[in-house]
Amino acid sequence: MARFDGKVVLVTGAGSGIGRAISLAFAGEGSRVVVADVDVNTGEETAHALTEIGAEAVFLQADVGKEEQVKAMVHKAVATYGYLDCACNNAGIAGTMARVADCTEENWDRTIGINLKGVWLCMKHEILQMLKQGHGVIVNTSSAAGLVGLQGWSPYVASKHGVIGLTRSAALEYAKANIRVNAVCPSIIKTGMAQCFTGGDQRVEAYILGQQALNRMGTPEEVAAAVLWLCSEEASFVTGHALAVDGGLLAH
């Protein structure tokens, strides 16, 4: 019997990268997966990939920065499968590179709006459902940049620090309701977003990788494995934790 047989899992930002890997990993362990993404094409591709391996999956389009869409997403997920065991709030963007004094209000608002407000909105409506059913697990995607500073990416760094703060607060607020809340904090992972940070410059990439003790990029599947562990009964005594999946970056 797989760890997640019959479990219902919601994954945002599931159309590509880490979100897609999380969806595939849950599907491979027996979950019914609600694939959520703002991009219809990539979201439907992920849902199709899950059904191709014999999993139950449904795609829901949602902009996580808009409450009515998030509320509808959670409602439709529960209407489809009856309940919500796990939620992985993974949708996010890199935003535009900017130092604090150079950042535009538009860049700040967009990055915070998706990466931080979006996670809060998802948590809000997921928790309301989990309170009704008496249990649940949430894993939010933060970043290694949520644990340290990073020059030139102030909106992104602020948003990811905020995700960890939300995670810890919610973990304390809802522990007695049998709801666990954790975060996963990847460093540079082999996804399209990595290009946003390196600009495709091999020298920049080499420098970043040199800061990671394992001297390579992580894979989406490695992050997904950490997420599944946090959602599993194996991590039943873990809540309020920010788990770095960083190749040793933060060991320095």
Q: What is each PLM-predicted segment?
A:
Residues 123, 159, 167:
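Active-site helix of classical SDR
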Residues 2-34:
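Canonical Rossmann dinucleotide-binding motif of NAD(H)/NADP(H)-dependent dehydrogenases/reductases
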Residues 98-100, 104-112, 208:
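Substrate-binding pocket helix/loop in short-chain dehydrogenase/reductase
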Residues 175, 180, 238-240:
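Short, small/polar-rich loop/turn modules that mediate ligand/substrate recognition or access, typified
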Residues 143:
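Residue(s) in the substrate-gating loop at a strand-loop-helix junction
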Residues 183-186, 203-238, 247:
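C-terminal helical subdomain
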Residues 94-97, 148, 228, 239-252:
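Short C-terminal tail/terminal secondary-structure segment
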